[in-house]
A protein has these predicted regions:
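C-terminal interaction appendages of subunits in large macromolecular complexes
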Residues: 1-184
Length: 184
């Protein structure tokens, strides 16, 4: 199987806090060289919210996932600070509406603000988009070695094969001992 085909099967790392990977040549570099940087960004949806009876609808941005190792509370605090000093314009309110069903940060926009411009500013001026350094490092014969994805998978398969052989030999030895006892 070719490296290109391998990269279509293994799409990228899965981070526990979610976020979406920006696929470009950097991920292929990580796969082929064993080291590189991956761009990950938070997930933003735009929706219209109703402010109350008789009031106009407004646009809001809903953030449902943050990049790995970004603190939600710290990110909201930093965003509020940027809005207060005027570095990000067009935001009227920021609310954390997270509950047991998942994360939800609602950013209410001002009446005539453009959601696309604000999304662009959020990615540029906050940690909503960040680079994550990746290195495929493994112990091979007791020494740390930087591996490509193909070598990494080959060593993993060798390890699994060895583990299964050891487990099978153990069960065979136990069964042989029981058989010897029963046979007398």
């Amino acid at each position: 199987i070719s490296d290109k085909k391998l990269s279509t099967i293994i799409l990228g790392p899965d981070f526990p806090t979610g976020g979406e990977l920006i696929y470009n040549d950097s991920l292929n570099e990580v796969y082929q060289k064993g080291r590189g940087s991956i761009i990950i960004r938070g997930v933003i949806k735009s929706e219209e919210i109703n402010l109350g009876k008789g009031k106009h609808k407004r646009n809001a941005l809903i953030i449902s996932e943050l990049p790995y190792q970004i603190s939600k509370a710290g990110w909201i605090e930093k965003l509020a600070e940027l809005v207060n000093i005027g570095k990000i314009d067009g935001i009227s309110d920021i609310r954390d509406e997270s509950d047991r069903d998942g994360m939800r940060i609602m950013i209410e926009l001002k009446k005539d603000s453009n959601p696309e411009i604000i999304i662009s500013n959020l990615y540029k001026k906050t940690s909503l988009q960040s680079n994550f350094g990746a290195i495929f490092l493994a112990l091979v014969d007791g020494k740390p070695v930087q591996l490509t994805l193909r070598k990494y998978l080959n060593y993993f398969l060798e390890f699994r094969e060895e583990t299964i052989k050891k487990r099978t030999n153990y069960f065979l030895r136990i069964a042989s001992e029981k058989f010897a006892i029963l046979e007398g």
